[in-house]
């Protein structure tokens, strides 16, 4: 009986480790942007069956990208305090298991999304490959611009969601992509500010490590400013109304305000770095929620 209980506990841990490979919190955030794009493209709630299939396929694609990322980054994950307890550096899964899981999950995502339409499947796969081949295997360890260029992968879900409903890409989808693309650097640079010692130890050339805190804070402010007009552009596509417009402006101004507070903060204080990081998460959630609410009112 005790052996059976132990086996069940071990099986449960293995399942949790495979789920951890997908970085579920990140996947949920990406699914929110993809679902919001579907909602806006449909002018309201999209068909239930289409939504379920698209969300499953997109979740598989994002999870596969994250799993292969963990496989490739297992050496630096073992060095960083934030990541050393992940399944691979902790020795709970082997590299072969992680890679096999990522490849199979990625292939399944393509097959699932192919039942929606070819464009949707290709866009999700392009995002996966860009994240793995361009960001993870090239940019992350070689350039200070890693997160700027690599952010294109994380901005792909709105394109996937839009294509699932319409079978094409429109300017509204491109603007949603742009919002996530511009949001990504200040979000991750805020994290990098209070994790800079980790990144330096691992040899990852994040902006605070290479250029210093002051330069990073100015870049966060710059991208936060760019978010305001970029997010507002969606209003002029006619897909959302003034509720969204003013919400995006208020959220953008709050993001800028947090960035100014961050700029004024002096080391070793990191209160505003944590606040900016947390606010950026709220910003992305609320702005995509505003898109959905306003298109419902239209």
UniProtKB/Swiss-Prot annotation:
Its main location: membrane. CDD domains: PT_UbiA_Cox10. It is an enzyme of class 2 (transferase). One of its GO terms (molecular function) is protoheme IX farnesyltransferase activity. GO terms for biological process: heme O biosynthetic process. Keywords: Cell membrane, Heme biosynthesis, Membrane, Transferase, Transmembrane, Transmembrane helix. It is a multi-pass membrane protein. Pathway: Porphyrin-containing compound metabolism; heme O biosynthesis; heme O from protoheme: step 1/1. Interacts with CtaA. PANTHER family: 4-HYDROXYBENZOATE SOLANESYLTRANSFERASE (PTHR43448:SF7), PROTOHEME IX FARNESYLTRANSFERASE, MITOCHONDRIAL (PTHR43448). This is Protoheme IX farnesyltransferase.
């Amino acid at each position: 009986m005790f052996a059976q209980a132990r086996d069940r506990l071990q099986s449960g841990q293995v399942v949790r480790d495979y789920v951890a490979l997908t970085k579920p919190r990140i996947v949920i955030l990406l699914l929110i942007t993809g679902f919001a794009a579907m909602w806006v493209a449909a002018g309201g709630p999209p068909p239930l069956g289409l939504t379920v299939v698209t969300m499953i396929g997109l979740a598989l694609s994002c999870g596969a990208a994250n799993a292969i990322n963990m496989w490739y980054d297992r050496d630096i994950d073992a060095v960083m305090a934030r990541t050393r307890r992940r399944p691979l550096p902790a020795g709970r899964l082997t590299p072969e298991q992680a890679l096999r899981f990522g490849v199979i999950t990625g292939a399944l995502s393509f097959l699932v999304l192919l039942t929606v339409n070819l464009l949707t499947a290709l866009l999700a796969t392009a995002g996966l490959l860009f994240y793995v081949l361009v960001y993870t295997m090239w940019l992350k360890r070689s350039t200070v611009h890693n997160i700027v260029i690599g952010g294109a992968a994380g901005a792909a879900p709105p394109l996937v969601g839009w294509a699932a409903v319409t079978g094409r890409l429109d300017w509204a989808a491109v603007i949603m992509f742009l919002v996530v693309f511009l949001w990504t650097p200040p979000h991750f640079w805020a994290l990098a500010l209070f994790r800079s010692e980790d990144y330096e130890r691992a040899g990852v050339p994040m902006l605070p490590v290479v250029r210093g805190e002051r330069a990073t804070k100015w870049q966060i402010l710059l991208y936060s400013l760019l978010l305001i007009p970029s997010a507002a552009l969606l209003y002029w596509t006619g897909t959302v109304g003034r509720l969204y417009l003013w919400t995006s402006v208020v959220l953008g101004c709050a993001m800028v305000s947090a960035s100014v507070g961050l700029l004024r903060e002096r080391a070793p204080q990191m209160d505003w770095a944590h606040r900016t990081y947390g606010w950026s998460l709220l910003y992305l959630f609320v702005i995509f929620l505003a898109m959905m609410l306003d298109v419902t009112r239209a």
